[in-house]
Protein backbone atom coordinates (compact mmCIF):
# COMPACT_ATOMS: atom_id res chain seq x y z
CA UNK A 1 0.00 0.00 0.00
CA UNK A 2 1.54 3.27 -1.13
CA UNK A 3 2.00 5.98 1.49
CA UNK A 4 0.10 9.22 1.30
CA UNK A 5 3.15 11.13 0.06
CA UNK A 6 3.84 8.49 -2.61
CA UNK A 7 0.23 8.72 -3.75
CA UNK A 8 0.52 12.47 -4.17
CA UNK A 9 3.52 12.02 -6.44
CA UNK A 10 1.91 9.12 -8.33
CA UNK A 11 -1.18 11.23 -8.89
CA UNK A 12 0.89 14.17 -10.17
CA UNK A 13 2.92 11.93 -12.51
CA UNK A 14 -0.21 10.19 -13.78
CA UNK A 15 -1.86 13.52 -14.64
CA UNK A 16 1.31 14.75 -16.31
CA UNK A 17 1.58 11.61 -18.47
CA UNK A 18 -2.07 11.28 -19.47
CA UNK A 19 -3.16 14.91 -19.56
CA UNK A 20 -6.18 14.11 -17.36
CA UNK A 21 -6.93 17.22 -15.32
CA UNK A 22 -9.96 15.85 -13.44
CA UNK A 23 -8.60 14.69 -10.06
CA UNK A 24 -11.61 12.45 -9.36
CA UNK A 25 -11.18 10.63 -12.66
CA UNK A 26 -7.43 10.25 -12.14
CA UNK A 27 -7.86 8.85 -8.62
CA UNK A 28 -10.53 6.42 -9.86
CA UNK A 29 -8.23 5.08 -12.60
CA UNK A 30 -5.37 4.70 -10.12
CA UNK A 31 -7.64 2.95 -7.60
CA UNK A 32 -8.74 0.50 -10.29
CA UNK A 33 -5.07 -0.40 -10.84
CA UNK A 34 -4.19 -0.48 -7.12
CA UNK A 35 -2.09 2.68 -7.52
CA UNK A 36 0.18 0.95 -10.07
CA UNK A 37 1.26 3.92 -12.17
CA UNK A 38 2.44 1.92 -15.19
CA UNK A 39 -0.70 -0.21 -15.31
CA UNK A 40 -2.91 2.86 -14.98
CA UNK A 41 -1.10 4.66 -17.83
CA UNK A 42 -1.30 1.57 -20.03
CA UNK A 43 -5.02 1.37 -19.30
CA UNK A 44 -5.49 4.93 -20.56
CA UNK A 45 -2.88 4.90 -23.37
CA UNK A 46 -2.59 1.30 -24.75
CA UNK A 47 0.42 0.79 -27.07
CA UNK A 48 0.79 -1.22 -30.29
CA UNK A 49 4.31 -2.49 -29.70
CA UNK A 50 4.06 -3.24 -25.99
CA UNK A 51 3.37 -1.75 -22.60
CA UNK A 52 5.42 0.71 -20.60
CA UNK A 53 8.09 -0.80 -18.39
CA UNK A 54 8.21 -0.14 -14.68
CA UNK A 55 11.46 0.57 -12.93
CA UNK A 56 10.41 -1.92 -10.26
CA UNK A 57 11.23 -4.98 -12.39
CA UNK A 58 9.22 -7.31 -14.62
CA UNK A 59 9.59 -8.84 -18.08
CA UNK A 60 11.00 -6.60 -20.82
CA UNK A 61 9.05 -6.51 -24.05
CA UNK A 62 11.01 -6.31 -27.33
CA UNK A 63 11.25 -3.03 -29.15
CA UNK A 64 12.96 0.31 -28.73
CA UNK A 65 11.62 0.90 -25.26
CA UNK A 66 13.37 2.32 -22.27
CA UNK A 67 15.82 -0.05 -20.53
CA UNK A 68 15.51 0.28 -16.79
CA UNK A 69 18.77 -1.61 -16.24
CA UNK A 70 20.82 1.18 -17.78
CA UNK A 71 19.02 3.85 -15.78
CA UNK A 72 18.72 2.80 -12.15
CA UNK A 73 15.98 4.59 -10.26
CA UNK A 74 17.22 6.99 -7.60
CA UNK A 75 15.84 6.93 -4.07
CA UNK A 76 12.53 8.70 -3.76
CA UNK A 77 12.56 12.13 -2.21
CA UNK A 78 9.64 14.40 -1.42
CA UNK A 79 10.42 16.50 -4.48
CA UNK A 80 11.35 13.71 -6.89
CA UNK A 81 8.96 11.82 -9.15
CA UNK A 82 7.95 8.27 -8.27
CA UNK A 83 7.82 7.40 -11.97
CA UNK A 84 11.01 7.88 -14.02
CA UNK A 85 10.44 6.06 -17.35
CA UNK A 86 8.11 8.74 -18.68
CA UNK A 87 10.04 10.35 -21.51
CA UNK A 88 10.78 7.12 -23.41
CA UNK A 89 7.05 6.54 -23.75
CA UNK A 90 6.95 9.41 -26.24
CA UNK A 91 9.13 7.39 -28.62
CA UNK A 92 6.05 5.26 -29.45
CA UNK A 93 4.60 7.12 -32.40
CA UNK A 94 1.15 5.57 -32.66
CA UNK A 95 -1.55 4.59 -30.16
CA UNK A 96 -4.40 2.19 -30.56
CA UNK A 97 -7.92 3.68 -30.63
CA UNK A 98 -9.58 3.66 -27.22
CA UNK A 99 -13.15 2.34 -27.11
CA UNK A 100 -15.70 3.94 -24.81
CA UNK A 101 -18.90 2.27 -23.60
CA UNK A 102 -22.01 4.40 -23.03
CA UNK A 103 -25.27 3.29 -21.47
CA UNK A 104 -27.92 5.85 -22.36
CA UNK A 105 -31.25 5.87 -20.49
CA UNK A 106 -34.42 7.32 -21.98
CA UNK A 107 -37.65 6.79 -20.06
CA UNK A 108 -37.98 3.01 -19.73
CA UNK A 109 -35.28 2.12 -22.29
CA UNK A 110 -31.52 1.64 -22.07
CA UNK A 111 -29.39 1.91 -25.22
CA UNK A 112 -25.76 0.69 -25.26
CA UNK A 113 -23.40 2.67 -27.52
CA UNK A 114 -19.72 1.78 -28.16
CA UNK A 115 -17.54 4.38 -29.92
CA UNK A 116 -13.88 5.32 -30.29
CA UNK A 117 -12.74 8.25 -28.22
CA UNK A 118 -11.96 10.09 -31.48
CA UNK A 119 -15.70 10.39 -32.21
CA UNK A 120 -17.82 13.37 -31.25
CA UNK A 121 -20.84 13.84 -29.03
CA UNK A 122 -22.94 14.46 -32.14
CA UNK A 123 -22.17 10.95 -33.43
CA UNK A 124 -23.65 9.51 -30.22
CA UNK A 125 -26.81 11.53 -30.85
CA UNK A 126 -27.02 10.25 -34.44
CA UNK A 127 -26.90 6.65 -33.19
CA UNK A 128 -29.55 7.45 -30.58
CA UNK A 129 -31.71 9.09 -33.26
CA UNK A 130 -31.87 5.74 -35.10
CA UNK A 131 -32.48 3.76 -31.91
CA UNK A 132 -34.99 6.04 -30.16
CA UNK A 133 -36.57 7.73 -33.21
CA UNK A 134 -35.92 11.15 -31.67
CA UNK A 135 -34.62 13.98 -33.89
CA UNK A 136 -31.18 15.23 -32.86
CA UNK A 137 -32.38 18.87 -32.46
CA UNK A 138 -35.03 17.67 -29.96
CA UNK A 139 -32.52 15.68 -27.92
CA UNK A 140 -30.59 16.81 -24.82
CA UNK A 141 -27.83 14.40 -23.81
CA UNK A 142 -27.16 14.76 -20.08
CA UNK A 143 -24.96 13.08 -17.50
CA UNK A 144 -21.54 14.47 -18.54
CA UNK A 145 -19.32 15.00 -15.51
CA UNK A 146 -17.97 18.22 -17.02
CA UNK A 147 -21.42 19.69 -17.53
CA UNK A 148 -23.18 20.34 -20.82
CA UNK A 149 -21.06 19.74 -23.93
CA UNK A 150 -21.41 20.73 -27.58
CA UNK A 151 -22.20 18.22 -30.33
CA UNK A 152 -18.81 18.94 -31.91
CA UNK A 153 -16.89 18.04 -28.75
CA UNK A 154 -14.45 15.15 -29.26
CA UNK A 155 -14.89 12.44 -26.65
CA UNK A 156 -11.14 12.17 -26.06
CA UNK A 157 -11.05 15.76 -24.84
CA UNK A 158 -13.51 14.91 -22.06
CA UNK A 159 -11.10 12.33 -20.50
CA UNK A 160 -13.90 9.85 -19.92
CA UNK A 161 -13.57 6.46 -18.20
CA UNK A 162 -14.29 3.35 -20.21
CA UNK A 163 -17.85 2.90 -18.90
CA UNK A 164 -20.21 5.88 -18.82
CA UNK A 165 -23.87 6.44 -18.00
CA UNK A 166 -25.89 9.16 -19.77
CA UNK A 167 -29.55 10.02 -20.09
CA UNK A 168 -31.68 11.75 -22.70
CA UNK A 169 -34.14 14.58 -22.04
CA UNK A 170 -36.75 15.70 -24.58
CA UNK A 171 -38.36 18.85 -23.13
CA UNK A 172 -39.74 19.90 -26.53
CA UNK A 173 -41.55 16.61 -27.13
CA UNK A 174 -44.97 16.02 -25.56
CA UNK A 175 -45.18 13.16 -23.06
CA UNK A 176 -46.80 9.91 -24.26
CA UNK A 177 -50.60 10.17 -24.17
CA UNK A 178 -51.35 6.47 -24.10
CA UNK A 179 -53.27 4.60 -21.48
CA UNK A 180 -49.98 3.87 -19.75
CA UNK A 181 -49.76 7.55 -18.72
CA UNK A 182 -52.34 7.01 -15.98
CA UNK A 183 -50.39 4.01 -14.72
CA UNK A 184 -47.13 5.96 -14.81
CA UNK A 185 -48.77 8.81 -12.89
CA UNK A 186 -50.08 6.40 -10.27
CA UNK A 187 -46.60 4.92 -9.95
CA UNK A 188 -45.13 8.41 -9.57
CA UNK A 189 -47.65 9.18 -6.81
CA UNK A 190 -46.26 6.23 -4.85
CA UNK A 191 -42.62 7.28 -5.35
CA UNK A 192 -40.56 9.42 -2.98
CA UNK A 193 -38.80 12.50 -4.36
CA UNK A 194 -35.63 13.81 -2.74
CA UNK A 195 -35.66 17.61 -3.04
CA UNK A 196 -32.22 19.16 -2.50
CA UNK A 197 -33.09 22.75 -1.59
CA UNK A 198 -30.37 25.38 -1.29
CA UNK A 199 -31.06 28.34 0.99
CA UNK A 200 -29.36 31.07 -1.04
CA UNK A 201 -28.75 33.61 1.75
CA UNK A 202 -27.02 31.23 4.19
CA UNK A 203 -25.62 28.83 1.56
CA UNK A 204 -27.12 25.82 3.30
CA UNK A 205 -28.71 22.79 1.71
CA UNK A 206 -31.68 20.80 2.97
CA UNK A 207 -32.47 17.31 1.74
CA UNK A 208 -36.21 16.81 2.09
CA UNK A 209 -38.04 13.62 1.22
CA UNK A 210 -41.59 14.00 -0.14
CA UNK A 211 -44.07 11.53 -1.58
CA UNK A 212 -45.31 12.01 -5.11
CA UNK A 213 -48.76 12.90 -3.76
CA UNK A 214 -47.42 15.91 -1.83
CA UNK A 215 -48.18 19.30 -3.32
CA UNK A 216 -45.90 22.20 -4.20
CA UNK A 217 -47.62 24.20 -1.45
CA UNK A 218 -46.63 21.58 1.14
CA UNK A 219 -43.00 21.83 0.02
CA UNK A 220 -43.05 25.61 0.41
CA UNK A 221 -44.61 25.36 3.86
CA UNK A 222 -41.92 22.91 4.97
CA UNK A 223 -39.25 25.26 3.66
CA UNK A 224 -40.87 28.06 5.68
CA UNK A 225 -40.44 25.93 8.82
CA UNK A 226 -36.74 25.44 8.02
CA UNK A 227 -35.78 28.90 6.74
CA UNK A 228 -38.39 31.19 8.36
CA UNK A 229 -39.09 32.66 4.91
CA UNK A 230 -42.88 33.05 4.51
CA UNK A 231 -44.31 31.42 1.42
CA UNK A 232 -45.30 34.75 -0.11
CA UNK A 233 -41.70 36.01 0.24
CA UNK A 234 -40.02 32.90 -1.17
CA UNK A 235 -38.16 33.32 -4.46
CA UNK A 236 -37.60 29.95 -6.16
CA UNK A 237 -35.34 28.68 -8.91
CA UNK A 238 -35.37 25.20 -10.40
CA UNK A 239 -39.08 24.37 -10.56
CA UNK A 240 -40.05 22.79 -13.91
CA UNK A 241 -42.06 24.96 -16.30
CA UNK A 242 -45.06 22.68 -15.79
CA UNK A 243 -45.17 23.42 -12.04
CA UNK A 244 -47.38 26.49 -12.39
CA UNK A 245 -49.85 25.79 -9.59
CA UNK A 246 -49.02 25.38 -5.89
CA UNK A 247 -51.83 22.82 -5.59
CA UNK A 248 -50.14 20.54 -8.14
CA UNK A 249 -48.75 17.29 -6.75
CA UNK A 250 -45.05 16.57 -7.21
CA UNK A 251 -45.73 13.55 -9.43
CA UNK A 252 -47.34 15.84 -12.02
CA UNK A 253 -44.90 18.73 -11.75
CA UNK A 254 -42.15 17.24 -13.92
CA UNK A 255 -39.50 16.93 -11.18
CA UNK A 256 -36.45 14.77 -11.84
CA UNK A 257 -36.53 11.40 -10.08
CA UNK A 258 -35.17 10.42 -7.60
CA UNK A 259 -33.43 13.76 -6.90
CA UNK A 260 -34.19 17.32 -7.92
CA UNK A 261 -32.30 20.47 -7.01
CA UNK A 262 -34.06 23.73 -6.10
CA UNK A 263 -32.89 27.10 -4.82
CA UNK A 264 -34.88 29.37 -2.53
CA UNK A 265 -34.23 32.87 -1.30
CA UNK A 266 -36.05 35.83 0.18
CA UNK A 267 -37.54 38.48 -2.08
CA UNK A 268 -35.55 41.67 -1.50
CA UNK A 269 -35.59 45.28 -2.65
CA UNK A 270 -33.42 46.31 -5.65
CA UNK A 271 -30.93 48.08 -3.34
CA UNK A 272 -30.41 44.98 -1.21
CA UNK A 273 -30.11 42.82 -4.32
CA UNK A 274 -27.36 45.08 -5.75
CA UNK A 275 -25.42 45.06 -2.47
CA UNK A 276 -25.60 41.28 -2.22
CA UNK A 277 -24.43 40.92 -5.83
CA UNK A 278 -21.38 43.09 -5.11
CA UNK A 279 -20.53 41.06 -2.01
CA UNK A 280 -20.87 37.76 -3.89
CA UNK A 281 -18.68 39.03 -6.74
CA UNK A 282 -15.99 40.00 -4.25
CA UNK A 283 -16.16 36.59 -2.57
CA UNK A 284 -15.85 34.74 -5.85
CA UNK A 285 -12.85 36.81 -6.87
CA UNK A 286 -11.09 36.10 -3.58
CA UNK A 287 -11.67 32.35 -3.87
CA UNK A 288 -10.49 32.24 -7.47
CA UNK A 289 -7.18 33.87 -6.49
CA UNK A 290 -6.28 30.95 -4.24
CA UNK A 291 -7.69 28.05 -6.26
CA UNK A 292 -4.74 27.70 -8.58
CA UNK A 293 -2.22 26.92 -5.83
CA UNK A 294 -4.31 24.59 -3.70
CA UNK A 295 -2.75 21.40 -4.94
CA UNK A 296 0.86 22.60 -5.14
CA UNK A 297 0.77 24.02 -1.62
CA UNK A 298 -1.09 21.10 -0.07
CA UNK A 299 1.92 19.39 1.46
CA UNK A 300 3.51 22.67 2.48
CA UNK A 301 0.52 23.85 4.47
CA UNK A 302 -0.32 20.45 5.97
CA UNK A 303 -3.52 19.79 4.06
CA UNK A 304 -4.72 16.28 4.89
CA UNK A 305 -5.17 13.42 2.42
CA UNK A 306 -8.92 13.79 2.31
CA UNK A 307 -8.53 17.32 0.90
CA UNK A 308 -5.75 16.37 -1.54
CA UNK A 309 -7.69 13.47 -2.99
CA UNK A 310 -11.12 15.10 -2.71
CA UNK A 311 -13.37 16.31 -5.46
CA UNK A 312 -11.84 18.91 -7.74
CA UNK A 313 -14.81 21.22 -7.38
CA UNK A 314 -15.15 20.99 -3.62
CA UNK A 315 -13.93 23.66 -1.26
CA UNK A 316 -12.46 23.29 2.21
CA UNK A 317 -14.85 21.62 4.59
CA UNK A 318 -16.66 24.11 6.71
CA UNK A 319 -18.39 21.71 9.07
CA UNK A 320 -18.16 18.06 10.10
CA UNK A 321 -20.47 15.47 8.62
CA UNK A 322 -22.12 14.96 12.00
CA UNK A 323 -22.06 17.00 15.21
CA UNK A 324 -20.16 15.56 18.13
CA UNK A 325 -22.22 14.24 21.06
CA UNK A 326 -25.46 14.66 19.13
CA UNK A 327 -28.36 13.87 21.43
CA UNK A 328 -30.95 13.47 18.69
CA UNK A 329 -30.07 11.01 15.92
CA UNK A 330 -32.58 12.60 13.55
CA UNK A 331 -30.95 16.04 13.86
CA UNK A 332 -27.51 14.49 13.41
CA UNK A 333 -28.61 12.74 10.22
CA UNK A 334 -30.17 15.95 8.90
CA UNK A 335 -26.77 17.63 9.17
CA UNK A 336 -25.09 14.53 7.68
CA UNK A 337 -27.39 14.60 4.65
CA UNK A 338 -26.94 18.33 4.11
CA UNK A 339 -23.15 18.14 4.38
CA UNK A 340 -23.03 15.04 2.15
CA UNK A 341 -24.98 16.90 -0.53
CA UNK A 342 -22.75 19.94 -0.34
CA UNK A 343 -19.63 17.80 -0.77
CA UNK A 344 -20.69 15.16 -3.28
CA UNK A 345 -23.61 16.60 -5.18
CA UNK A 346 -27.34 16.26 -5.23
CA UNK A 347 -27.53 12.73 -6.64
CA UNK A 348 -26.93 10.41 -3.71
CA UNK A 349 -28.83 7.74 -1.75
CA UNK A 350 -31.82 8.90 0.24
CA UNK A 351 -30.60 8.64 3.82
CA UNK A 352 -33.25 7.69 6.37
CA UNK A 353 -33.75 10.50 8.89
CA UNK A 354 -34.33 8.99 12.31
CA UNK A 355 -32.90 6.58 14.82
CA UNK A 356 -31.52 3.16 13.92
CA UNK A 357 -34.50 1.57 15.66
CA UNK A 358 -36.84 3.62 13.47
CA UNK A 359 -34.95 2.42 10.40
CA UNK A 360 -35.48 -1.17 11.61
CA UNK A 361 -39.19 -0.48 11.92
CA UNK A 362 -39.32 0.98 8.42
CA UNK A 363 -37.37 -1.88 6.82
CA UNK A 364 -38.28 -5.02 8.78
CA UNK A 365 -41.39 -4.64 10.92
CA UNK A 366 -43.93 -4.33 8.14
CA UNK A 367 -45.76 -6.87 6.01
CA UNK A 368 -43.45 -9.36 4.31
CA UNK A 369 -44.25 -7.96 0.87
CA UNK A 370 -43.20 -4.45 1.94
CA UNK A 371 -39.95 -5.35 3.68
CA UNK A 372 -36.58 -4.11 2.44
CA UNK A 373 -32.93 -4.61 3.20
CA UNK A 374 -31.22 -2.11 5.49
CA UNK A 375 -27.99 -0.55 4.22
CA UNK A 376 -25.85 1.21 6.84
CA UNK A 377 -23.21 3.57 5.47
CA UNK A 378 -20.35 4.25 7.92
CA UNK A 379 -18.44 7.40 6.99
CA UNK A 380 -14.93 8.42 8.09
CA UNK A 381 -13.44 11.75 7.00
CA UNK A 382 -9.85 10.72 7.74
CA UNK A 383 -9.86 7.80 5.30
CA UNK A 384 -8.21 8.39 1.92
CA UNK A 385 -10.89 6.22 0.28
CA UNK A 386 -13.85 8.24 1.49
CA UNK A 387 -14.07 10.90 -1.20
CA UNK A 388 -13.57 8.45 -4.07
CA UNK A 389 -16.09 5.98 -2.64
CA UNK A 390 -18.72 8.67 -2.07
CA UNK A 391 -18.31 10.56 -5.33
CA UNK A 392 -17.67 7.65 -7.70
CA UNK A 393 -19.45 4.67 -6.15
CA UNK A 394 -22.10 5.76 -3.67
CA UNK A 395 -23.32 8.62 -5.87
CA UNK A 396 -23.37 6.63 -9.11
CA UNK A 397 -26.84 6.81 -10.64
CA UNK A 398 -27.14 3.03 -10.91
CA UNK A 399 -26.26 2.58 -7.22
CA UNK A 400 -28.58 5.40 -6.12
CA UNK A 401 -31.48 3.96 -8.12
CA UNK A 402 -30.91 0.40 -6.87
CA UNK A 403 -30.65 1.50 -3.25
CA UNK A 404 -33.78 3.65 -3.43
CA UNK A 405 -35.83 0.79 -4.86
CA UNK A 406 -34.65 -2.07 -2.65
CA UNK A 407 -33.03 -0.65 0.50
CA UNK A 408 -33.60 1.64 3.45
CA UNK A 409 -30.29 3.51 3.72
CA UNK A 410 -29.12 4.78 7.12
CA UNK A 411 -25.81 6.56 7.71
CA UNK A 412 -23.47 7.41 10.58
CA UNK A 413 -20.17 9.28 10.85
CA UNK A 414 -17.39 7.55 12.81
CA UNK A 415 -14.83 10.36 12.49
CA UNK A 416 -15.37 11.56 16.06
CA UNK A 417 -14.57 9.10 18.86
CA UNK A 418 -17.80 9.89 20.70
CA UNK A 419 -19.93 9.14 17.63
CA UNK A 420 -17.88 6.00 16.98
CA UNK A 421 -18.44 4.77 20.54
CA UNK A 422 -22.14 5.52 20.30
CA UNK A 423 -22.51 3.50 17.09
CA UNK A 424 -20.53 0.58 18.53
CA UNK A 425 -22.96 0.52 21.45
CA UNK A 426 -25.90 0.43 19.03
CA UNK A 427 -24.12 -2.21 16.95
CA UNK A 428 -23.46 -4.43 19.97
CA UNK A 429 -27.10 -4.15 21.02
CA UNK A 430 -28.63 -4.89 17.62
CA UNK A 431 -26.08 -7.07 15.79
CA UNK A 432 -24.04 -8.72 18.52
CA UNK A 433 -20.49 -8.43 19.79
CA UNK A 434 -18.92 -10.14 16.75
CA UNK A 435 -20.01 -7.44 14.30
CA UNK A 436 -19.21 -4.71 16.83
CA UNK A 437 -15.69 -6.12 17.24
CA UNK A 438 -15.28 -6.35 13.45
CA UNK A 439 -16.08 -2.65 13.06
CA UNK A 440 -13.98 -1.73 16.11
CA UNK A 441 -10.88 -3.37 14.61
CA UNK A 442 -11.23 -1.74 11.19
CA UNK A 443 -8.37 0.60 10.35
CA UNK A 444 -9.04 4.13 9.20
CA UNK A 445 -7.92 3.43 5.62
CA UNK A 446 -10.42 0.55 5.41
CA UNK A 447 -13.32 2.95 5.77
CA UNK A 448 -15.92 3.79 4.61
CA UNK A 449 -17.95 0.64 5.30
CA UNK A 450 -21.27 -0.43 3.89
CA UNK A 451 -23.26 -2.90 6.01
CA UNK A 452 -26.09 -4.90 4.45
CA UNK A 453 -28.61 -5.98 7.10
CA UNK A 454 -31.49 -8.41 6.68
CA UNK A 455 -34.21 -8.64 9.31
CA UNK A 456 -35.15 -12.13 10.47
CA UNK A 457 -37.81 -13.44 12.80
CA UNK A 458 -35.85 -13.13 16.03
CA UNK A 459 -32.67 -11.26 15.08
CA UNK A 460 -30.99 -9.03 12.52
CA UNK A 461 -28.45 -10.71 10.25
CA UNK A 462 -25.49 -8.86 8.70
CA UNK A 463 -25.27 -10.26 5.17
CA UNK A 464 -22.25 -8.32 3.99
CA UNK A 465 -19.62 -5.81 5.12
CA UNK A 466 -18.37 -3.88 2.07
CA UNK A 467 -15.16 -1.88 2.43
CA UNK A 468 -14.37 1.34 0.61
CA UNK A 469 -11.72 -0.11 -1.73
CA UNK A 470 -14.23 -1.39 -4.27
CA UNK A 471 -15.63 -0.48 -7.67
CA UNK A 472 -19.10 0.41 -8.88
CA UNK A 473 -19.51 -2.96 -10.59
CA UNK A 474 -18.33 -4.89 -7.54
CA UNK A 475 -20.54 -2.83 -5.24
CA UNK A 476 -23.54 -3.43 -7.48
CA UNK A 477 -22.74 -7.14 -7.68
CA UNK A 478 -22.59 -7.47 -3.91
CA UNK A 479 -25.81 -5.50 -3.48
CA UNK A 480 -27.54 -7.77 -5.99
CA UNK A 481 -26.16 -10.88 -4.26
CA UNK A 482 -27.57 -9.66 -0.95
CA UNK A 483 -30.85 -8.92 -2.70
CA UNK A 484 -31.03 -12.50 -4.00
CA UNK A 485 -30.60 -13.87 -0.47
CA UNK A 486 -33.18 -11.42 0.83
CA UNK A 487 -35.66 -12.26 -1.97
CA UNK A 488 -35.47 -15.97 -1.17
CA UNK A 489 -36.06 -15.27 2.52
CA UNK A 490 -38.81 -12.78 1.66
CA UNK A 491 -40.67 -15.39 -0.41
CA UNK A 492 -40.57 -17.79 2.54
CA UNK A 493 -41.79 -15.04 4.86
CA UNK A 494 -44.58 -14.14 2.42
CA UNK A 495 -45.63 -17.79 2.24
CA UNK A 496 -45.57 -18.13 6.04
CA UNK A 497 -47.45 -14.85 6.43
CA UNK A 498 -50.08 -15.90 3.88
CA UNK A 499 -50.51 -19.27 5.59
CA UNK A 500 -50.75 -17.61 8.99
CA UNK A 501 -53.24 -15.09 7.66
CA UNK A 502 -55.24 -17.91 6.05
CA UNK A 503 -55.29 -19.76 9.37
CA UNK A 504 -56.34 -16.62 11.17
CA UNK A 505 -59.07 -16.04 8.60
CA UNK A 506 -60.33 -19.61 9.06
CA UNK A 507 -60.24 -19.15 12.82
CA UNK A 508 -62.08 -15.84 12.53
CA UNK A 509 -64.68 -17.45 10.29
CA UNK A 510 -65.06 -20.35 12.71
CA UNK A 511 -65.35 -17.97 15.66
CA UNK A 512 -67.93 -15.93 13.77
CA UNK A 513 -69.88 -19.05 12.82
CA UNK A 514 -69.73 -20.25 16.43
CA UNK A 515 -70.92 -16.86 17.65
CA UNK A 516 -73.79 -16.86 15.17
CA UNK A 517 -74.65 -20.42 16.20
CA UNK A 518 -74.70 -19.40 19.86
CA UNK A 519 -76.90 -16.44 19.06
CA UNK A 520 -79.24 -18.67 17.03
CA UNK A 521 -79.41 -21.22 19.84
CA UNK A 522 -80.04 -18.49 22.37
CA UNK A 523 -82.75 -16.97 20.19
CA UNK A 524 -84.32 -20.40 19.68
CA UNK A 525 -84.16 -21.11 23.40
CA UNK A 526 -85.69 -17.76 24.24
CA UNK A 527 -88.45 -18.31 21.67
CA UNK A 528 -89.15 -21.76 23.10
CA UNK A 529 -89.25 -20.35 26.59
CA UNK A 530 -91.66 -17.65 25.48
CA UNK A 531 -93.83 -20.26 23.77
CA UNK A 532 -93.84 -22.49 26.83
CA UNK A 533 -94.70 -19.54 29.04
CA UNK A 534 -97.55 -18.60 26.70
CA UNK A 535 -98.82 -22.18 26.66
CA UNK A 536 -98.63 -22.31 30.43
CA UNK A 537 -100.54 -19.05 30.68
CA UNK A 538 -103.21 -20.24 28.28
CA UNK A 539 -103.40 -23.55 30.08
CA UNK A 540 -103.89 -21.76 33.35
CA UNK A 541 -106.65 -19.64 31.84
CA UNK A 542 -108.25 -22.73 30.36
CA UNK A 543 -108.10 -24.54 33.68
CA UNK A 544 -109.55 -21.58 35.47
CA UNK A 545 -112.32 -21.36 32.93
CA UNK A 546 -113.03 -25.09 33.22
CA UNK A 547 -113.04 -24.90 36.97
CA UNK A 548 -115.35 -21.96 36.80
CA UNK A 549 -117.67 -23.78 34.40
CA UNK A 550 -117.56 -26.88 36.51
CA UNK A 551 -118.46 -24.89 39.57
CA UNK A 552 -121.38 -23.30 37.71
CA UNK A 553 -122.49 -26.69 36.44
CA UNK A 554 -122.42 -28.20 39.90
CA UNK A 555 -124.32 -25.29 41.37
CA UNK A 556 -126.96 -25.59 38.64
CA UNK A 557 -127.18 -29.33 39.10
CA UNK A 558 -127.72 -28.90 42.83
CA UNK A 559 -130.33 -26.21 42.25
CA UNK A 560 -132.48 -28.41 39.99
CA UNK A 561 -135.76 -29.61 41.49
CA UNK A 562 -136.02 -33.37 41.89
CA UNK A 563 -137.15 -35.33 38.85
CA UNK A 564 -140.85 -36.28 39.23
CA UNK A 565 -141.98 -39.84 38.93
CA UNK A 566 -143.99 -41.10 35.98
CA UNK A 567 -147.05 -41.73 38.15
CA UNK A 568 -147.15 -38.25 39.57
CA UNK A 569 -150.43 -36.59 40.38
CA UNK A 570 -149.40 -33.50 38.47
CA UNK A 571 -148.93 -33.50 34.73
CA UNK A 572 -145.41 -34.56 33.73
CA UNK A 573 -143.55 -33.64 30.56
CA UNK A 574 -140.84 -35.99 29.28
CA UNK A 575 -138.06 -34.37 27.25
CA UNK A 576 -135.42 -36.07 25.10
CA UNK A 577 -132.48 -33.82 24.19
CA UNK A 578 -129.99 -34.88 21.51
CA UNK A 579 -126.44 -33.56 22.03
CA UNK A 580 -124.07 -32.60 19.15
CA UNK A 581 -122.24 -35.89 19.69
CA UNK A 582 -125.44 -37.91 19.05
CA UNK A 583 -126.16 -38.87 22.62
CA UNK A 584 -129.55 -38.26 24.24
CA UNK A 585 -130.34 -36.65 27.53
CA UNK A 586 -133.68 -37.70 29.02
CA UNK A 587 -135.53 -36.22 32.01
CA UNK A 588 -139.01 -35.69 33.31
CA UNK A 589 -140.26 -32.28 34.32
CA UNK A 590 -143.49 -31.08 35.78
CA UNK A 591 -145.56 -29.39 33.15
CA UNK A 592 -145.73 -26.45 35.49
CA UNK A 593 -141.93 -26.12 35.68
CA UNK A 594 -140.55 -23.05 34.06
CA UNK A 595 -138.51 -23.28 30.86
CA UNK A 596 -135.51 -21.93 32.82
CA UNK A 597 -135.29 -25.24 34.68
CA UNK A 598 -134.79 -27.04 31.33
CA UNK A 599 -132.03 -24.57 30.47
CA UNK A 600 -130.38 -25.18 33.85
CA UNK A 601 -130.62 -28.94 33.31
CA UNK A 602 -128.92 -28.69 29.92
CA UNK A 603 -126.26 -26.38 31.42
CA UNK A 604 -125.63 -28.83 34.25
CA UNK A 605 -124.75 -31.39 31.60
CA UNK A 606 -122.05 -29.10 30.18
CA UNK A 607 -124.06 -27.22 27.58
CA UNK A 608 -124.59 -23.66 28.88
CA UNK A 609 -127.48 -21.95 27.20
CA UNK A 610 -125.32 -18.92 26.23
CA UNK A 611 -123.21 -21.26 24.05
CA UNK A 612 -125.84 -23.68 22.81
CA UNK A 613 -129.39 -23.38 21.61
CA UNK A 614 -132.29 -25.84 21.84
CA UNK A 615 -134.24 -26.51 18.69
CA UNK A 616 -137.57 -28.25 18.26
CA UNK A 617 -138.53 -29.90 14.96
CA UNK A 618 -142.32 -29.63 14.85
CA UNK A 619 -142.69 -26.75 14.64
CA UNK A 620 -139.05 -25.82 14.06
CA UNK A 621 -138.15 -23.18 16.51
CA UNK A 622 -135.40 -21.99 18.79
CA UNK A 623 -136.57 -22.77 22.29
CA UNK A 624 -133.82 -20.67 23.85
CA UNK A 625 -135.45 -17.60 22.30
CA UNK A 626 -138.66 -18.22 24.30
CA UNK A 627 -139.43 -16.61 27.61
CA UNK A 628 -137.63 -18.73 30.25
CA UNK A 629 -140.27 -17.81 32.87
CA UNK A 630 -143.07 -19.57 30.99
CA UNK A 631 -144.01 -23.10 31.93
CA UNK A 632 -143.43 -26.11 29.74
CA UNK A 633 -147.13 -26.39 29.25
CA UNK A 634 -147.33 -22.81 28.01
CA UNK A 635 -144.57 -23.34 25.43
CA UNK A 636 -146.12 -26.65 24.28
CA UNK A 637 -143.34 -28.91 25.58
CA UNK A 638 -145.91 -31.33 26.96
CA UNK A 639 -146.39 -34.25 27.41
CA UNK A 640 -143.16 -35.14 25.62
CA UNK A 641 -140.83 -33.53 23.16
CA UNK A 642 -137.55 -34.21 21.42
CA UNK A 643 -135.11 -31.29 21.29
CA UNK A 644 -131.72 -30.82 19.61
CA UNK A 645 -128.67 -29.07 21.05
CA UNK A 646 -126.75 -26.97 18.56
CA UNK A 647 -123.75 -24.74 19.20
CA UNK A 648 -124.34 -21.09 18.61
CA UNK A 649 -122.40 -19.49 15.79
Curated annotation (Swiss-Prot):
Q: What InterPro entries does the database record attribute to this sequence?
A: FAF1-like_UBX, FAF1_2-like_UAS, FAF1_UBA, Thioredoxin-like_sf, UAS, Ubiquitin-like_domsf, UBX_dom, UBX_domain-protein
Q: Where is the composition biased (Low complexity)?
A: 68-82
Q: Name one GO molecular function term.
A: NF-kappaB binding
Phosphoserine: residues carrying this PTM: 319, 581
Q: Where in the cell is it found?
A: Nucleus
Cite the PROSITE patterns for this sequence.
UBX
Phosphothreonine, modified sites = 579
Q: Write down what this protein is called.
A: FAS-associated factor 1
Classification from the root reads: Eukaryota, Metazoa, Chordata, Craniata, Vertebrata
Name the gene for this chain: Faf1
